[in-house]
Amino acid sequence: MSKKRLHEIAKEIGKSSKEVVERAKSLGLDVKSHASSVEEADANKIASSFSAGVTKNVQAGSAKDKQVAEQKAKAAKATTPQPAASKAAEKPAAATQEASQPVAVKPKSRNFKAEREARAKEQVARRQAGQNRSNDRKSDYRQLGRSQGQQTERAGHKSQNQQRDRRFDNRPSSGNNRNDGHRQAGNRDKNRSFNANSRQQDIGRQGQTQAGAPKIDFKARAAALKAEQNAEYARQRESRFREQEEAKRLEQQARQEAKAAALKAQTEDKKHREAPAKATEPAEPVASMAAAPVAKPVDKRRKKQNRPDKAHDRDHGLEDGQKKNKKSWNSQNQVRNQKNSNWNNNKKNKKGKHHKNSNTAPKPVTERKFHELPKEFEYSEGMTVAEIAKRIKREPAEIVKKLFMMGVMATQNQSLDGDTIELLMVDYGIEAKAKVEVDEADIERFFTDDNYLNPDNIVERAPVVTIMGHVDHGKTTLLDTLRNSRVATGEAGGITQHIGAYQIEEAGKKITFLDTPGHAAFTSMRARGASVTDITILIVAADDGVMPQTIEAINHSKAAGVPIIVAINKIDKPGANPERVISELAEHGIISTTWGGECEFVEISAKFNKNIDELLETVLLVAEVEELKADPTVRAIGTVIEARLDKGKGAVATLLVQQGTLHVQDPIVVGNTFGRVRAMTNDLGRRVKSAEPSTPVSITGLNETPMAGDHFAVYADEKAARAAGEERAKRALLKQRQNTQRVSLDNLFDTLKAGEIKTVNVIIKADVQGSVEALAASLLKIDVEGVRVNVVHSAVGAINESDVTLAEASNAVIIGFNVRPTPQARQQADADDVEIRLHSIIYKVIEEVEEAMKGKLDPEYQEKVLGEAIIRETFKVSKVGTIGGFMVVNGKVTRDSSVRVIRDSVVIFDGKLASLKHYKDDVKEIGNAQEGGLMIEGFNDIKVDDTIEAYVMEEIIRK
């Protein structure tokens, strides 16, 4: 069943919500307010209870309404100079009502909704009556041309006419006269007739009307209905007025009691402070103050409403509905004003002097609190006067005045420089200190700040060991042996392409290993590994000895200041000579402890797992000597070992935690990127929730791929991390723009010279960030005179369509290192004729790019003299030219060779041969000591004894 709210029921039956709520409670329904809902049956029950009560009240109140109407009529007949008589006439009525009810009836408000509905019904009835009259006129016009012989049919339609007459009973009597006139006109014009049946019915209806149908006095009926409505309205107004008066009386009574209690408390308080003789004086104001807010406002308003020359005279000519509406509006204002009567009294009292009866003492003036000046003031450049005043608890006007006395014109919103602030603080006697601004975007401060770590929480951490050495000396094989796996066979060409970070456990202690590439291209990666390591294991093959990358690794380790453990590998080979390795390393400052040095030497065989335990024991011994400590309680900081772009995970970074503990969901800034640690995996590929110091982990959740070697730091919240990351990215972009060189007078010639150098544009895409760096650095080091490499773009990830579009626009070659192009990118590259080179070994990339650079140069040619000939005779042929007969004196003369005409050791002409003949035959060449004839293109001034030198231009192959 549907439910209804009480205010909807009140709206339907024309009652107030309060009455409906009270009636529902009296019927036993569980309701709380007008917004409560009841069932349909309960709603009908409430409505029926009101309808039953209304009929009783209307019958009971009809006699009272008659008395009220008679009293109003008597008051209207009385003249205006007799107001006393009208008041005397009103008093008996009031007396009778007071006799029946305890509170005087004072109807001031009406049910406007019911009045509007009644007026709307009357208007609808009037419109219907007007339509009926217009229909009667139309039907009367149709009566033209009726004959008297049709009256016999009227009796047959008598019943129908009687039913129709009931709808037209309210027509005025003047309409009959008009109908008579029309009927006479119809007798004069009988020829214009149509629709005979309708005319007969209309004539029968008029005859019935003329027969004297009973007329209803609508005015009397409307007056009776209005009297009933007024009686109902009066009853409702009486009940509301009684409720309002009762509530008002209770409210005023409570207010008087509260004020009396307050005044009594004040009186008792004064009794303790004043003399005993004056203890009884405050008794009089209590009564006056208690009576004041009740008597005065009510009397004033009643006199104002009963003035006969104002509203009553102005509303005398208005209609009943308008007049009642205006009274109701005034009554609502009266109720509102009576509720706020005390507020008005207080307002009036505030305008003038204090009330005579009020004995409240004036409020004492609150004295401003005096604040001590601070001893120190930490300021920042650009502080305003208002900010300084707030900090030192002084008025801005006071500071402005002091500045004016110092000769500085300033307002409270004006910024001050540091010197002015210091002078102002000296005037106040405060020690001024400049605030040290902390750069939140600076990650390096976490690594250099000694106060970042808590000495009480320092614990021992695992050592970070970097394995370094020359290419194919067994670095990855050693690490593979330590991890008991076989990833070494997966390296392309036996070369480690990027850093691998792994952690093993030996004798209950953990050791973190970093595997670095040994190729010359990975210098930056070796330097990066040495910067984050604690111990360096230098792998040297016993059969190869010290190699260039071995020396480089030694230099990196010395620069980082880390201890070096030398592992002489491949001692199982027949040509192994460990003593030669020890002596070669001694030449570079790596001296064994057996020779009195500081470096530990261990002879191992990574392939056959020989002396590996001894190597690990040496690592733990050196780590114990180094006393490696860390604080796991602080926010994590560390270094990026490697970074790559995964198709499904996005940016993936391999981090080495150096201090603190890294947790999942930590807000982090990595280099110029930022994000939140979404997932974290260890070296075994298992997900972990935290990473302690010296632990390598791979994380996801960064907005971009960071650079390998960047530092990272965990921030307090994501907002701070985002701000720091964006600021670092902005600074990096600004630095990159500043590195762009502009043409000036100083470097104009260098720029012009550089424009003559040819460039090979390349786009590098690799699997990890370290490989990208190594490739770019290696290609830039290629030295070919007149050609240089321009790296247009480098990034990690697969070759995509945007790379192909960029390569087409910049005429570049795409180099993919351990990556492949997407199908869409390959299709677009074929369509745009873009060259994509895919490689997995770095030195093959370098060789290929070097060949491309050499082919980019313009070919160089070298002149090669083929032979010489002397002109013995000339023949001039018309329309052909001059033919020179010659004899080859040295070498040969070929048909496609170029020739020089030399006369008296001076070159007269240099050009091509037009023809070469031996007797009458065209030949390709004429050898030594042979004769022949020739013609030269564009030259006919051949003379006897001229020397003809034949030569060709040969291309020089670049080395």
Curated annotation (Swiss-Prot):
Q: In which residues is GTP bound?
A: 469-476, 515-519, 569-572
- Main location group: cytoplasm
**UniProt keyword list:** Cytoplasm, GTP-binding, Initiation factor, Nucleotide-binding, Protein biosynthesis
Region entry G3, spans: 515-518
* Signal peptide range: none
| Biased amino acid composition, Low complexity | 76-100, 277-287, 328-346
Q: Does the keyword Nucleus apply?
A: no
Q: Where is this region: G4?
A: 569-572
Ranges in coiled-coil conformation? none
Q: Where are the transmembrane segments?
A: none
**Job of this protein:** One of the essential components for the initiation of protein synthesis. Protects formylmethionyl-tRNA from spontaneous hydrolysis and promotes its binding to the 30S ribosomal subunits. Also involved in the hydrolysis of GTP during the formation of the 70S ribosomal complex.
Q: Where is the composition biased (Basic residues)?
A: 347-357
Q: Which organism is it from?
A: Streptococcus equi subsp. zooepidemicus (strain H70)
Q: Which residue ranges does the record annotate as region G1?
A: 469-476
- Stretches of Basic and acidic residues bias are at 63-73, 112-125, 134-143, 179-192, 234-258, 266-276, 306-323
Domain named tr-type G: which ranges? 460-629
What PANTHER family has UniProt attached to this entry?
A: TR-TYPE G DOMAIN-CONTAINING PROTEIN, TRANSLATION INITIATION FACTOR IF-2-RELATED
The record's region (Disordered) falls at: 33-373
Q: Where in the cell is it found?
A: Cytoplasm
Family that this chain belongs to: Belongs to the TRAFAC class translation factor GTPase superfamily. Classic translation factor GTPase family. IF-2 subfamily.
What name goes with this protein?
Translation initiation factor IF-2
The UniProt annotation puts the region (G2) at: 494-498
The keyword Lyase appears for this protein: no
